[in-house]
Amino acid sequence: MYKFTIATALAALAAAGDTSAWKERSVYQVLTDRFAKSDGNNGACTDLSNYCGGNYQGMIQNLDYIKGMGFDAIWISPIVKNKEPGYHGYWATNWEDVNEHFGSKDDLKALVEAAHAKDIWVMVDVVANHVAPIGDDFSQIYPLNQSYHYHSDCDINWNDQNSVENCRLAGLPDLDQSNDYVRGYLKDWVKGIVQEYSFDGIRIDTIPEVPADFWSEYGQAAGVFQMGECFNGDPAYVGPYQNHLTALFNYPMYYTIGDVFGSSKSMYNIRDRYNQESQHFNDIDALGVFVDNHDNPRFLHNHSGNKTGLKQAVTFSLTSRGIPFTYYGTEQFYSGAADPQNRESLWQDMDTSSELYGMIGKIHAQRKASQIWNSEQVERYVEDNFYAYSRGDFLVALTNTGNTK
């Protein structure tokens, strides 16, 4: 297991902040393999199903690109050693080692230190549901290498929650958190990496695929802010998981954002969505609000290159209730389709003169000047094609009329 000093642990706790502190932050999501390289070769990646060469040193060298948009937190890919070609980080094989494609343990520590020096918090992606696609050859996994560490091999029936929690997601061996060793190891591991690397928060993959009571213990073990992924658009299904973790991604609002700003559906859908969410979430202001991510085709792909709609959607995500999350490449109008096409390399397109890059920076400046996180969001006016709201002295007026390419 990881060894760490008391001083390191205290430093991590001091940086991490609580939920209220994270509400002040705006997060830039990067795929470590796709954001920036350190070798100077900046040609676009042509094989998006394999490693492209992004690493921690490249990220260190380009933190100013992130800071230039006003972001003060980053979400990075899972850090553990992966089965090839697990460029995304979700195919763990050795939980005690790091992914050598991204760099060494010292490189990772240097990234966190460099980010903190620029007042950028670091959220690390973690997985406690599954391991790499190794069939039933559990000897390939360390240290969870026994068959009894896993549930039986079965395919998920998404209409049966017991199946969701006990069967394999996309054929990936499903960890059995009811096993005392597995449960204890996963909690010790997340506590260890947070304290060794001074992470400020964790993003947790595949929340509904694990019994909810485990997440209460896991989050407590981590000791920092948790943002859970429940890939579902129903507030009644997603909401109860906030009883076990500090926060969740607002997937229900994600679908509404696409509908109203991408497809010009009625803005009353925003009001309706908030009304639904108020019945099922215990803290809407802690939910992660996003337009794009690595699991969904990008907004511009889903909505026929609607750049005007994207700008409206990004404005909403940065200023409405919740913690803003912006996926790398959105600021460069990326339009990738489903995975892996939505996981483009960025290093060839780090254009700080991009219209959306500049717009995001200006919105962040106003967001911080008004400290909008301290003010309740108040709906001021709504019509089918118009939505206005205020947060203190900060007024936002959005339209989806004329949203075209």
What are these regions (language model features)?
Residues 1-16:
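Fungal secretory targeting signals
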Residues 8, 162, 290-291:
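Active-site-adjacent bridging/hinge elements
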Residues 176, 301-303:
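Second-shell loop/turn segments in exported
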